[in-house]
Every structure is written in structure tokens, then in C-alpha cells.
Amino acid sequence: MSKKNPNLEDELSLFQDAVKGVKKFTHDTIITRRQQNSKVDKAKVSSKETQNHEFYFSDEFEPHLNEHGPTQYARTGVSKYEVKKLRRGIYVPDMYLDMHGMTQQEAKRELAAMLAACIKESVSCACVMHGIGKHILKKKAPLWLAQHPDVMAFHQAPLEFGGNGALLVLIDIPER
């Protein structure tokens, strides 16, 4: 036994009467698909970025750095006492760069930008925190820094500035 609501039938007939003369609407809007970046485009962008930063740092060049003991470097003509001041934490960094979680290309770009900012702002000491992790950036950061013409010296940072996971960098600021 089915019970039909007479109100439903009335409402349905009212609706059909209301839409009796309506014509079907034709759709004239064109839907365009978004172009997806292809892998080729991404490869071109990353190769351009690589070329821009190869000016500052090369992955093939490896300066002679002491493999035993803390990571340190002094450019020719820089006093060993300057390196000693870095080791003791006498130079306090005014600018910090944290490279945790960065790729090598990102780290190169940020390191170059930090050195340029240090020169622009006349900051003579900076701290580069490469972290310990898988030792990739820990090995690469000193090699890159030793190639930069404005880096006078660097030394593994004292514990208060990061210890094994950081370097204090002494930067040559040109006189204005």
C-alpha cells in the first residue's frame, strides 16, 4: 500500500506549468586547459640557475684544506692570529645563514647572496650554519667559501655559534 502525498503532485504540476516555455540553454563558453610545465622547461630553468652561480663557486675546484682537526682556511697574506680570533669567538657574526634542508644549488645561491649582502652592509664576520646531517653541505661549504675572492678566512665556529655544524667567516670589506 503506497501513500502518495497529494501536495507533491500539485507542486510537480505547478513546477511543470512554470517551466513550460523554457528552451534549453546552449553552452557557449570555451574551457581551456592549463598548460603544464614540461620537464624540459624545468630543466632549462635549473640549468640557467646553475650557470649563474657557477661564476661564484665551482664544484670541481678543491682547495687544499686541512682534513684533520677543525675546518679552517686563511687566504694568502692573512695573519694566523685572525684565524685564531675566529676560533676563539672574538669576532662576533653580524649575519647568519642557515642552510639546513637546502639543496646544493640553493645553498650556493644563498651563500653568494649572503656574501654580497655582507659586503653591501659592511659586515666583516658572518656565520654559515651548514649542519651536520649527511655531511654534504658540511663538505661543500668550505670548498665554496675558499673560492670566493672576498673571503679572507674561515674557521669552525665555537659552540655558542654552532660548533661542528657552522663556520665563522671573515670577509674582506673594500674601503669606500
Swiss-Prot record:
Note the superkingdom of the native organism. Bacteria
Q: Which InterPro entries match?
A: Smr_dom, Smr_dom_sf, SmrB-like
Instruction: Give an example GO molecular function.
Output: RNA endonuclease activity
**E.C. code:** 3.1.-.-
Q: PROSITE patterns annotated for this entry?
A: SMR
A biological process term (GO) from this entry: rescue of stalled ribosome
- Smr domain sequence ranges: 97-172
The UniProt keyword set, sorted, is: Endonuclease, Hydrolase, Nuclease, RNA-binding, rRNA-binding
Class of the enzyme per the UniProt entry, highest EC level: hydrolase
Main function: Acts as a ribosome collision sensor. Detects stalled/collided disomes (pairs of ribosomes where the leading ribosome is stalled and a second ribosome has collided with it) and endonucleolytically cleaves mRNA at the 5' boundary of the stalled ribosome. Stalled/collided disomes form a new interface (primarily via the 30S subunits) that binds SmrB. Cleaved mRNA becomes available for tmRNA ligation, leading to ribosomal subunit dissociation and rescue of stalled ribosomes.
Family that this chain belongs to? Belongs to the SmrB family.
Q: How does it assemble?
A: Associates with collided ribosomes, but not with correctly translating polysomes.
Name of the protein this chain belongs to: Ribosome rescue factor SmrB
Species of provenance: Photobacterium profundum (strain SS9)
